Amino acid sequence: MDERQVFVCKLIGKKELFYKGDENYLLIYVYHDQIYNLDNGTQVDTLLSNDSGVAFIVKTKEGTIYHAGDLNDWYWDGEPKADNQRLTSAYRAEIRKIKGMHFDAAFVPLDPRQGNHYADGILYFLKNVDCNVIFPMHYWNDANVIKRFITEYPQYKSRIKNTECAKGEEL
């Protein structure tokens, strides 16, 4: 089993491990707020997303990575104030669980669809978590939002990576 690649997926009403198609892949359906120890020594912790699925903390001997998935401070203009407050509270509660942790890399939403609130989630993350480098995601093919963030918050420039690159270019 050590030679298999592992994909960790959100729970869809199943607890068992199973193989689908290619026996080289092991699918593990996961719950939030759990710790999964893989055969290769990797540990995967999960947080509850306030949108869909889970966020992942992947700990290996080489380092630790955070992948937010859809966990973000989702504030939407035009939505009821109570809905926005609930999403913000849920996001902050999950980030408090990892407050003070160190990540070698993180993948965090920076979503231009949120208008003036596009950076609320990443700012809260940066203020509460230690991270060497952050790769913005969920920017809907609008990489200008990364430049906007770096311009508005130059103190984080050294840690934010522009994930828009040409085909074949490495990050």
Predicted regions span which residues?
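Active-site metal-binding motif and surrounding structural segment of the metallo-beta-lactamase
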Residues: M1-K20, R96-F107
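Structural motif
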Residues: F7, I65-A68, A105-F107, F135
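Active-site metal-binding loops of divalent metal-dependent hydrolases
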Residues: L11-I12, S49, A68-W74, L110-P112, ...
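Glycine/Thr-rich phosphate-binding loops of Rossmann-like dinucleotide-binding domains
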Residues: E16, Y75, N116, N144
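Short acidic/polar alpha-helix capping motifs at helix-coil junctions
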Residues: F18-E23, V58, Q85-S89, P154-I160
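Binuclear metal-ion centers of metallo-dependent hydrolases, dominated by the metallo-beta-lactamase
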Residues: Y25-D39, K97, Y118-L171
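Core dinuclear metal-dependent hydrolase active-site scaffold
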Residues: Y25-H102, C165-L171
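Active-site-proximal segments of metal-dependent phosphoesterases and phosphodiesterases across multiple
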Residues: E79-R86, A105-K127
